[in-house]
């Protein structure tokens, strides 16, 4: 199901089933432990997400009238072609530190594959530090206590992971994309932040 560009009576985006579309890709994963206290891992999801034939119903002059615009072989909305993750895991006795960097490629906000209506690619890094304490003698039945701290987005990247688009044709004469008003909305993600946690096992 994909959004057509039309709205319901209460303003919700209408969707339709696109028969001539496909998603094709591969997932890769690898890991390596060169030392007893060090593990390196990575994974990648690579895909192609295509609508072979798509009709956008674009509003005209902010009105309830629509104009059909046809697209051939456009990319499905919110479908990045690459998602990459890398992990560096250092662990010694009860102390564990995990460095995680991820990358997400460009995502289009609608099915027109218009670069002006897209989320730029982004990358961000988190670090998780934890310490596991197992008392020699159980205290009130306590088996283990894990103290953790998450350092999120440590490089304070400014990026958006989701968003939306509203577009209307201002002049119904001529090419529909030459005189078009577009309004973008982005959902920004948090900058650098710290979270702590405590987990207990009985």
Language-model regions, residue ranges each:
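Short, surface-exposed loop/helix-turn segments at secondary-structure junctions
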Residues: 112-117, 142
